[in-house]
Structures are given as C-alpha cells and as structure tokens.
C-alpha cells in the first residue's frame, strides 16, 4: 500500500457548505456507514468505527470548538 504524505490543513467553508457536510456526516453515522469527504483536493474516507470528540479551547479573548474525527488507517 502506498504511504500517504503527512499533511495538516485547515479549510474554511461558507455556512451552507459546512451545514451540508455536517448533514452528510450525521446521515453516515446514523447508518453506521463510512463517510467520504473531499478536503483541499484530497478525498478522505472516514471509517464507520472512527472516534468522535468535541474539543473546546479558550485563550485570552478567543474561543474555539473543534469537532474531531480520528481513526487509524488499515494496513499501516
């Protein structure tokens, strides 16, 4: 299996596009199916057994909420 290059990308989306992605994610979760998403030109497949967490950060006057999805790629 070809090794994928490391990357760390943050991509902004308009509200309507973000909502559509969340809806597709919720639909996949409810059906216990994998979730496919394209981020900055790369298609990502999130397995149905991924781990979902919500993180909250506060520093100074800034706050951040991150919805995180983590998994280990098979065959590594």
Predicted regions and their residues:
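Terminal, regulation- and interaction-focused segments at domain boundaries
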Residues: 1-25
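N-terminal intrinsically disordered, cationic/polar leader segments
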Residues: 2-8, 34-38, 42-76
């Amino acid at each position: 299996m070809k090794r994928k290059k490391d990357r760390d990308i943050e991509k902004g989306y308009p509200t309507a596009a973000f909502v559509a992605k969340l809806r597709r994610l919720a639909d996949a979760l409810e059906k216990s199916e994998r979730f496919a998403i394209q981020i900055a030109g790369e298609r990502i497949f999130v397995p149905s057994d991924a781990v979902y967490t919500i993180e909250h950060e506060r520093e100074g006057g800034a706050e951040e909420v991150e919805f995180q999805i983590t998994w280990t790629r098979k065959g590594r």
